[in-house]
Amino acid sequence: AGVPQVDQETSVRQLTRRVARTIRQVGEAFGGYFASAKDAESFEAELTHLLAYQYGAFNSPVWFNCGLWHEYGIEGGGGNYYWDMETKSVQITKNAYEHPQNSACFIQGVDDSLDTMLELQKSEVRLFKYGSGTGSNFSRVRAKGEPLSGGGESSGVLSFLEGFDRWAGSIKSGGTTRRAAKMVILDMDHPEIVDYIDWKLNEEKKAKILIAAGYSADFNGEAYHTISGQNSNNSVRIPDSFMNSYLKDGKWQTTYRMDGKSADEYDAKWLMDKIAYAAWACADPGVQFDDVIQRWHTCKGTGRINATNPCSEFVFLDDTACNLASLNLVKFMREDGEFDVEAYRHAIRVFITAMEIIVDLSSYPTERIARRSHDFRPLGLGYANLGTFLMLNGIPYDSSEGRAWAGVLSAILSGHGYQTSAEIAGNVGTFDCFEENRESMLEVMNLHRDAAYRIDKVSSSSIGGQLDLNCPDYMLDAAREDWDVCLQMGEQFGYRNSQISVIAPTGTIALLMDCDTTGIEPDFALVKFKKLAGGGYFKIVNRSVAEALEHLGYADEQVEEIIAYIIGIGTLKGASHINEETLKSKGFTEEDLAKIEATLSSAFDLNLAFVPGIVDEECLKRLGINPEETQDPEFNMLKSIGFRQEEIDAADEAICGNGTIEGAPHLKEKHYSIFDCANKCGRIGTRFIEPMGHVRMIAAVQPFISGAISKTVNLTNEAAVDDIKNVYVEAWKLGVKCMSIYRDGSKSSQPLSSNSRDDTLEEKLESHDSLQPIRKRLPDERQSVTHKFSVAGHDGYITVGFYDDGSPGEVFLKMSKEGSVISGLIDTIATMTSILLQYGVPLESLVDKFSHVRFEPSGFTSNQDIPIAKSIIDYVFRWLGQKFLSQ
């Protein structure tokens, strides 16, 4: 921001004071927000307290930009647009920080003309430059082959999308190394919908061929820089009519943009298969359910909602912006275990007031966005740390009680937020376009209120899906009271804001609030490895686990033992079998043990602390070990000095932990689900939250949120295409607005199992003979790539040969130490892998099977992407996975 090098901000106190004071001063200048100067001072003090004590946080642009001019006199280049309160018109900024860009989310419209597309490109570049994201629906753009007014035919929407994608890839968002954030949407009835669905899938195939030819697999490398479609999230806009046609095995008609005549007709089932398969293979496109979105649209009188921001939480009219903020739910828990409803309401009231002031304080990239943001004033208040909140209260994430809590917290958030908006409207007036949307606004408010009265059995009124929920009465009463008052005040005063809430990802600001979980997400895993600024890693356990165990009634000693089971004691002191005393008796000195001890806090395997580099040659001699012995791939130092395998395993578990709570001492099995995470935990963990658990959570929250919920449904690598279709159908039935999925390892890969497919999607098998295994040998001359590696000082080479399409077909492994038993076994595994690949066994199946296989030698590697390997085979297959199955 051009902050001078002298006298920079050095504390959160300075940061929060700058932001809170600026908002207070601007609110006073605008008038109508505070009854007196004393009230304004109280507002500033309360906002500062909420920010400084991590009760809530604004979106990043507010922290980056707000108050730099007001507090420090810092100026920036002009060119944006803002609403001038004196002239009641949009003006162009001369100083970027007098009216800073405070919104993170933008939606921009685009019409079927070169002028509007060029203007969109210009405004997108400006948004990316200042660190914001934008989304657009390109369905108005005519399809390939449609006539042009001056003669000839259109090159089609995809040709323009490729151009927009190239510009987005050229701009580093906010001047950082992060790429631009962009959403592209196409309606299901667009004539180019099939090519659009396949766009990213086909481009990923090209990337795979380039990578196989030796180009870097890094996302910022030359291979991905060469292909298109890599700089946006892609979504398809799906109406109810398509979903009904799909469920009834019906047809789907596409229409030309210019004359509305019929274009190609498809089987709806075939189209859904393509959407699900593309998402299965490369995570795009996501889906947006159009009729659900329009049903909850507060401003139907102005126009329909066509698009969303890149993360799909801001869902509103074209050419509008939204400033976001999120509350930290954990901060509103009382010591008696109840939720502090009044404190939560007060924080909502303060933040909504602040965000409302920010609307006209801000500037925007185009004149139209500046005007429409002023006219509609949408806000995006949400929350973070839901996963931690539920864990602390002993509530499983995937449970009726967990969903009920999420629903009621969301209901109070929006109900009290709209209530505050109505109160402000009584003082300074409604948003300018309220009257033309009064009917639809009150209609949606009634939908929200009705949902609050059936929060214990949330259902989609149009589809019929429902969820059984369970929630404390005092929370239900608070939610219903807020919506009753909200509706009464709205009917009397109207509303100052057309929208009030979203559930954003909260990635950066969750760190500012010290949250263990982001947005609506559960915890990723109980144990994580935190990278240290000075190098190395530090093992941490979710801090909420111990507190949750205490709330469940476990004694302090039991909690300590459970935590030790998860993360290990991280020290030799007091460990079973292998400890300071037993190691000293073998010949280790205090100095030797200090070196080993220093590695244990971050080690996930005890053997990795007893390798050359940590144990020096002098120590080896004292132990009676010839240094040359350690070069043997089968060498295990702990075994060589007399420890039995069962002793090593017991010490490993005690010192390094299990990474999971499953099987922990004292823990009752009925409590396992409270600690379930998005992924399997540790080496022995088997539990994780199923995909439908994520879908049901989104569905429980959606009826109480103005916008949508930014959340990805994670699926395991083994998930099938049908699993994704089931997720989409269930989400639609439950009234979810937007949905994206990610299957682990889903980049340019093939299905793990045979799925029933329409014969128009791929050729139908003609006979049972075609089901017999067929070996596809490589051509005599083929391309290959060789990779040198080192595991615990043992050097080797991996050579991968490719088919003509760039897919791996053979693997050779060569260890520098020839003639050893391990070298022969590794050569056998390489031959076996080659034959399996040539018989069509998917590489991802082999990677999944052989990754993390543990035997000696193991230890540090020469590859920064795989810093530690549990064995040579572990390294080889993890490298194959990183190289050929993901970005």
For each feature predicted by the language model, list its residue ranges.
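Nucleotide/phosphate-binding sheet-loop regions of phosphoryl- and nucleotidyl-transfer enzymes
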Residues: 187, 843, 851-853
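A glycine-rich helix N-cap at a beta->alpha junction
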Residues: 872-879
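Short, surface-exposed loop/turn segments at secondary-structure boundaries that line and modulate
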Residues: 823, 849-871
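Conserved, well-folded catalytic cores of nucleic-acid-processing
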Residues: 170, 835, 839, 853-856, ...
